[in-house]
């Protein structure tokens, strides 16, 4: 989810998410029921949502983290 205040949005969708991550202005929400999350976000203008099934990239990011410059 991109747009809006990620902290505020995370509180709104927290009951429907198994895990939430915030990286910069983007909120990553891992949920078994994306429709519940979309329903909570209806009416919030200026949001961009991307929905996709989990894959090996998610496993990699979970193990290594999202920040590239973390270990420099």
Curated annotation (Swiss-Prot):
The lineage of its organism: Bacteria, Pseudomonadati, Pseudomonadota, Alphaproteobacteria, Hyphomicrobiales. It is a peripheral membrane protein. It comes from Rhizobium leguminosarum bv. trifolii. Belongs to the ABC transporter superfamily. Lipooligosaccharide exporter (TC 3.A.1.102) family. Part of the ABC transporter complex NodIJ involved in the export of the nodulation factors (Nod factors), the bacterial signal molecules that induce symbiosis and subsequent nodulation induction. Nod factors are LCO (lipo-chitin oligosaccharide), a modified beta-1,4-linked N-acetylglucosamine oligosaccharide. This subunit is responsible for energy coupling to the transport system. GO terms for cellular component: plasma membrane. Its EC number is 7.6.2.-. The keyword ATP-binding applies. This is Nod factor export ATP-binding protein I. The keyword Plastid does not apply. GO terms for molecular function: ATP binding. Keywords: ATP-binding, Cell inner membrane, Cell membrane, Membrane, Nodulation, Nucleotide-binding, Plasmid, Translocase, Transport. The complex is composed of two ATP-binding proteins (NodI) and two transmembrane proteins (NodJ). Transmembrane segments: none annotated. It is an enzyme of class 7 (translocase). It is found in: Cell inner membrane.
């Amino acid at each position: 989810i991109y747009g809006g205040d990620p902290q505020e949005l995370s509180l709104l969708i927290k009951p429907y998410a198994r895990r939430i991550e915030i990286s910069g202005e983007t909120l990553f929400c891992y949920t078994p029921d994306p429709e519940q999350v979309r329903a909570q976000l209806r009416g919030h203008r200026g949001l961009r949502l991307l929905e996709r099934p989990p894959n090996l990239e998610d496993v990699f990011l979970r193990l290594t983290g999202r920040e590239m410059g973390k270990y420099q």
